[in-house]
């Protein structure tokens, strides 16, 4: 048995006699490979290629037979089991077939529209945030109808509510026990709608609209009825003053004046 490390060898033309053996275990020695292929014919050389620095097997080697018929018989079983592991072999002149790791399947992608993937649907919907003690079912039972600020008529403008043209927000103001404050927003963005919510107890509710800037409403406890509106103006007549009748005697003469209303 020849076990030279000279892969090129000096055996003349080995185009039909040299067999490539790949997929070997790392601990496979050339003696184990020789013992497997000796049954096909005389072997001139059997080598396992190893790393020059670590001297560790690279997992493949070569077997050179004495005649081409032996090499052909050895390649009939292209996936032999050597040293307890399935290997692969073929003529070295055809090129080595190193065993590759199984191809990883690419993750499934969502439905595509032509060559472009369909983006997820993003709707212009409002997102609600509830304070503690306020459930989603309570939110669904309420009638979310867009109304002006807490029942005030649209024509009403609070005297202490100012609008800053440069910043673009409505200043904070107290309205019938409520305190409303808007965060600054660019003028080009539409103002969010306001919804009628009656909530008891302290807390903060965030009403989101299709705008990155979200208004904040701080709700204070109140004990008024839900129907909130303007107090009806009441007018009263001026108070009238009356003087009692005056009677008496002046200089012996009796005088009497009537009451003035």
UniProtKB/Swiss-Prot annotation:
Keyword Nucleus: yes
Pfam families cross-referenced by the UniProt entry: RRM_1
Domain RRM: 17-94
Keyword RNA-binding: yes
Ranges annotated as spanning the membrane: none
Any one of the GO BP annotations: response to abscisic acid
One GO cellular component, as annotated: nucleus
GO MF: mRNA binding
Keywords: Nucleus, RNA-binding, Stress response
Compositionally biased residues, Polar residues: 102-116
Record-linked SUPFAM superfamilies: RNA-binding domain, RBD (SSF54928)
Record's note on what induces expression: Down-regulated by abscisic acid (ABA).
SMART domains in UniProt: RRM (SM00360)
Broad class of the protein's primary localization: nucleus
Region described as Disordered: spans on this chain: 96-122
Consequences of knocking out this gene: No visible phenotype under normal growth conditions, but mutant seeds have decreased germination rate in presence of abscisic acid (ABA) or salt, compared to wild-type.
Tissue spec: Expressed in vasculature of leaves, roots and siliques.
Compartments reported by the entry: Nucleus
Biological role: Probable RNA-binding protein involved in the regulation of abscisic acid (ABA) response during seed germination. May regulate transcript levels of several germination-responsive genes under ABA.
Name of the protein in its database record: Probable RNA-binding protein ARP1
Species of the source: Arabidopsis thaliana (Mouse-ear cress)
Lineage of producing organism: Eukaryota, Viridiplantae, Streptophyta, Embryophyta, Tracheophyta
Gene: ARP1
């Amino acid at each position: 048995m020849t076990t030279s490390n000279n892969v090129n060898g000096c055996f003349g033309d080995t185009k039909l006699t040299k067999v490539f053996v790949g997929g070997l275990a790392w601990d496979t020695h050339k003696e184990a490979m020789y013992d497997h292929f000796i049954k096909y014919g005389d072997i001139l050389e059997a080598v396992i290629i190893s790393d020059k620095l670590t001297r560790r097997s690279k997992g493949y080697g070569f077997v050179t037979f004495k005649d081409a018929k032996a090499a052909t018989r050895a390649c009939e079983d292209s996936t032999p089991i050597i040293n307890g592991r399935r290997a692969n072999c073929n003529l070295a002149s055809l090129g080595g077939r190193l065993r590759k790791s199984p191809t990883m399947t690419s993750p499934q992608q969502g439905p595509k529209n032509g060559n472009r993937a369909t983006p997820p649907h993003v709707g212009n919907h409002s997102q609600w945030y509830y304070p503690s003690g306020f459930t989603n079912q309570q939110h669904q039972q309420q009638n979310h109808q867009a109304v002006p600020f807490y029942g005030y008529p649209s024509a009403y403008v609070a005297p202490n509510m100012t609008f800053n043209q440069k910043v673009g927000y409505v200043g904070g103001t107290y309205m019938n026990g409520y305190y409303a404050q808007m965060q600054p927003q660019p003028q080009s963005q539409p103002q969010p709608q306001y919804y009628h919510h009656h909530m008891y107890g302290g807390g903060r509710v965030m009403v989101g609209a299709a705008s990155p800037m979200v208004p904040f409403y701080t709700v204070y406890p109140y004990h008024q009825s839900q129907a909130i509106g303007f107090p009806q103006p009441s007018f009263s007549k001026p108070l009238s003053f009356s003087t009692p009748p005056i009677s008496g005697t002046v200089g012996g003469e009796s005088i009497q004046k009537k009451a003035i209303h």
